[in-house]
């Protein structure tokens, strides 16, 4: 029960980048794949996890650039890899400035990892730049 409460707290404190990416991934909007936010696996909470493709999408703020945090992130990735889970990492700033690139990277990884690939026409629509 503590895991569920912790996940709820993390969802309430999401960053602007997490809100942006969640708007793409929630409710199977992203080519029909189901993602969960702040999904607990072991002692870790994954930002966005797709069980079907065993894919974890992480959004990192500037604190992840510090050596001790990078070491922690590496340990976490090794733990997840040992369970067959691939992690994609994006800087928060990248997810906004390069939104289409971020979406394409997630889509391509889903295509490579999911038990069934989707036809190209299911690729998420290109983002339209606001003027």
Predicted regions and their residues:
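Basic, amphipathic alpha-helical patches used to engage nucleic acids or provide basic targeting signals
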Residues: 9-14, 20, 37, 42-111
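Solvent-exposed, charged helical/coil patches
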Residues: 1-33, 82, 111-131
């Amino acid at each position: 029960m503590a895991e569920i409460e912790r996940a709820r707290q993390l969802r309430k404190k999401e960053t602007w980048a997490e809100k942006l990416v969640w708007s793409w991934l929630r409710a199977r909007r992203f080519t029909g794949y189901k993602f969960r936010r702040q999904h607990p696996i072991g002692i870790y909470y994954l930002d966005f996890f797709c069980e079907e493709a065993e894919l974890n999408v992480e959004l990192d703020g500037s604190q992840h650039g510090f050596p001790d945090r990078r070491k922690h992130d590496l340990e976490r990735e090794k733990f997840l890899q040992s369970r067959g889970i691939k992690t994609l990492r994006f800087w928060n700033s990248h997810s906004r400035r390069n939104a289409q690139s971020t979406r394409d990277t997630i889509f391509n990884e889903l295509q490579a990892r999911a038990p069934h690939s989707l036809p190209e026409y299911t690729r998420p629509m290109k983002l339209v730049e606001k003027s």
